[in-house]
Amino acid sequence: MQQDRTYRHHGPEVSGWFSEQLMTGKIPLTEVFVDVENKPSPAPITIISKNPKTTRKSDKQVQTDDASSLLTEEVKAAINSVISAVRRQTNAIESLEGRVTTLEASLKPVQDMAKTISSLNRSCAEMVAKYDLLVMTTGRATATAAATEAYWNEHGQAPPGPSLYEDDAIKAKLKDPNGKVPESVKQAYINLDSTSALNEENFGRPYISAKDLKEIIYDHLPGFGTAFHQLVQVICKIGKDNNILDIIHAEFQASLAEGDSPQCALIQITKRIPAFQDASPPIVHIKSRGDIPKACQKSLRPVPPSPKIDRGWVCIFQFQDGKALGLKI
């Protein structure tokens, strides 16, 4: 029976081998034929019958390992794809940030042009109003004021071409109840007068801020935290309070154009502009001398009875204990 199993499982080659081994005595009969009454040892059968099962399990394990390996490769490929996409997005974002920064830098001059455009706008409005009046009141010498007035009286309007007439004369005629001025001329004069008044009221104010003026002057000064830097802050503060920042700016630029140094230009501002004449320097409250910039330490002096800005006194440093030192240039 065992031989049949062996034959079934292993084929005729193995069966012939067993026969040869039995005939030569190399395999004892006691190991092959077992008494039916005695329970046969299942070891040979177990070994022979379980070998295919073990092979199947091994095959399944190999298949499982292959599937896991394939899944791992797919996961790795997916992760690499995601990493590549994230890198591309990061590069695109960095490129966009660079372009936005470049665009901001390019638009900065346009923003700075706003003040110039505003100034041109009001200048053009005033120029148009003056031109309307100019066409009606000035021109060829042959068209005298008397001829123009005669034309007014006859036709009730301004002559078609330019004519000579002074601005003050029109103003006097408008105030005169008996004066005859054409409606078109009157309207042109009113437009010019209202435009001039509007410019003086709305555009006569500083077109530069205290911060901008401070930065402009700082760019011309060497070092940092010097007595002249302190003077710039004082000048800008007083200029803002007195609404004269544009005058200070013009005076500073004029001094530089004349060849003066920035320090000399600042001193000239304190001496030429009335707001600084006989003006007392501001008081700066500090805790100790260490709060004063190092560049100003050598310019500290005892405070005189009546310090003035136009005499070189920039500010007064007031300590907590009541003592005071003046910054002198």
UniProtKB/Swiss-Prot annotation:
<keyword id="KW-1035">Host cytoplasm</keyword>
<dbReference type="InterPro" id="IPR031163">
    <property type="entry name" value="VP35_IID"/>
</dbReference>
<dbReference type="GO" id="GO:0039723">
    <property type="term" value="P:symbiont-mediated suppression of host cytoplasmic pattern recognition receptor signaling pathway via inhibition of TBK1 activity"/>
</dbReference>
<keyword id="KW-0175">Coiled coil</keyword>
<keyword id="KW-0832">Ubl conjugation</keyword>
<keyword id="KW-1113">Inhibition of host RLR pathway by virus</keyword>
<keyword id="KW-1093">Inhibition of host IRF7 by virus</keyword>
<keyword id="KW-1223">Inhibition of host TBK1 by virus</keyword>
<dbReference type="InterPro" id="IPR043060">
    <property type="entry name" value="VP35_IID_hlx"/>
</dbReference>
<feature type="modified residue" description="Phosphoserine">
    <location>
        <position position="194"/>
    </location>
</feature>
<keyword id="KW-0922">Interferon antiviral system evasion</keyword>
<dbReference type="GO" id="GO:0003723">
    <property type="term" value="F:RNA binding"/>
</dbReference>
<feature type="cross-link" description="Glycyl lysine isopeptide (Lys-Gly) (interchain with G-Cter in ubiquitin)">
    <location>
        <position position="298"/>
    </location>
</feature>
<comment type="function">
    <text>Plays an essential role in viral RNA synthesis and also a role in suppressing innate immune signaling. Acts as a polymerase cofactor in the RNA polymerase transcription and replication complexes. Serves as nucleoprotein/NP monomer chaperone prior to the formation of the large oligomeric RNA-bound complexes. Regulates RNA synthesis by modulating NP-RNA interactions and interacting with DYNLL1. VP35-NP interaction controls the switch between RNA-bound NP and free NP and thus the switch between genome replication and genome packaging into the nucleocapsid.</text>
</comment>
<keyword id="KW-0694">RNA-binding</keyword>
<protein>
    <recommendedName>
        <fullName>Polymerase cofactor VP35</fullName>
    </recommendedName>
</protein>
<feature type="modified residue" description="Phosphoserine">
    <location>
        <position position="306"/>
    </location>
</feature>
<dbReference type="GO" id="GO:0030430">
    <property type="term" value="C:host cell cytoplasm"/>
</dbReference>
<feature type="domain" description="VP35 IID">
    <location>
        <begin position="204"/>
        <end position="329"/>
    </location>
</feature>
<keyword id="KW-0597">Phosphoprotein</keyword>
<keyword id="KW-1225">Inhibition of host TLR pathway by virus</keyword>
<keyword id="KW-0945">Host-virus interaction</keyword>
<dbReference type="GO" id="GO:0039557">
    <property type="term" value="P:symbiont-mediated suppression of host cytoplasmic pattern recognition receptor signaling pathway via inhibition of IRF7 activity"/>
</dbReference>
<keyword id="KW-0899">Viral immunoevasion</keyword>
<dbReference type="GO" id="GO:0039722">
    <property type="term" value="P:symbiont-mediated suppression of host toll-like receptor signaling pathway"/>
</dbReference>
<keyword id="KW-0941">Suppressor of RNA silencing</keyword>
<dbReference type="InterPro" id="IPR002953">
    <property type="entry name" value="Filo_VP35"/>
</dbReference>
<keyword id="KW-1224">Inhibition of host IKBKE by virus</keyword>
<keyword id="KW-0804">Transcription</keyword>
<dbReference type="GO" id="GO:0044423">
    <property type="term" value="C:virion component"/>
</dbReference>
<dbReference type="InterPro" id="IPR043061">
    <property type="entry name" value="VP35_IID_b-sht"/>
</dbReference>
<keyword id="KW-1017">Isopeptide bond</keyword>
<comment type="subunit">
    <text>Homodimer. Homooligomer; via the coiled coil domain. Interacts with nucleoprotein NP and polymerase L; VP35 bridges L and NP and allows the formation of the polymerase complex. Also interacts with VP30; this interaction is regulated by VP30 phosphorylation. Interacts with host IKBKE and TBK1; the interactions lead to inhibition of cellular antiviral response by blocking necessary interactions of IKBKE and TBK1 with their substrate IRF3.</text>
</comment>
<keyword id="KW-1090">Inhibition of host innate immune response by virus</keyword>
<feature type="region of interest" description="Chaperones the nucleoprotein">
    <location>
        <begin position="1"/>
        <end position="49"/>
    </location>
</feature>
<feature type="coiled-coil region">
    <location>
        <begin position="84"/>
        <end position="108"/>
    </location>
</feature>
<keyword id="KW-0693">Viral RNA replication</keyword>
<dbReference type="Pfam" id="PF02097">
    <property type="entry name" value="Filo_VP35"/>
</dbReference>
<keyword id="KW-0946">Virion</keyword>
<dbReference type="GO" id="GO:0039724">
    <property type="term" value="P:symbiont-mediated suppression of host cytoplasmic pattern recognition receptor signaling pathway via inhibition of IKBKE activity"/>
</dbReference>
<comment type="similarity">
    <text>Belongs to the filoviridae polymerase cofactor VP35 family.</text>
</comment>
<feature type="modified residue" description="Phosphothreonine">
    <location>
        <position position="195"/>
    </location>
</feature>
